[in-house]
Amino acid sequence: MGQERLDNANPTLFDSKPRHRPVTGTERDESVEDPIDSWEIFDLIRDINDPEHPYTLEQLNVVQEELIKVFIDEEETFVKVNFTPTIPHCSMATLIGLAIRVKLLRSLHPKVKVSVSITPGSHSTEESINRQLADKERVAAAMENQGLMHAVNECLRVPE
């Protein structure tokens, strides 16, 4: 958004999923613990804005519920999100991954472990970007960088 040269000047747009899923009886029962699932994670990240286009990551099919896995055991919850850049040489892939990670870190309980990575085979430098996104120290340093956090916050900004 706001760049002069776009990596993908004409992205394909996809239909959005319905906002609400059917609610089961146990989900209405406040006495039953309702563990987090892939749909809830998808719902948290679907409206993240693309850094280049006036569309959401869902509209561009960058994030998909099918690429989100939630693992829960008695000790911890682990969320793994794969995302698919619109083109294999997308220069914004690291920023998109960071925006997803920051959104989840801000939204989920601190005990939930989060992993964000590029869908295998979908980016020319996926290995390098995945290493950056998995490095807690690099992510923490990025979150302290005002310019980078401004870009991330623009991605996370709710449209008016």
Swiss-Prot record:
Keywords: Chromosome partition. One of its GO terms (cellular component) is cytosolic [4Fe-4S] assembly targeting complex. Transmembrane segments: none annotated. Residues 1-32 are annotated as: Disordered. May play a role in chromosome segregation through establishment of sister chromatid cohesion. PANTHER family: CYTOSOLIC IRON-SULFUR ASSEMBLY COMPONENT 2B (PTHR12377:SF0), CYTOSOLIC IRON-SULFUR ASSEMBLY COMPONENT 2B-RELATED (PTHR12377). Belongs to the MIP18 family. This is MIP18 family protein F45G2.10. The lineage of its organism: Eukaryota, Metazoa, Ecdysozoa, Nematoda, Chromadorea.
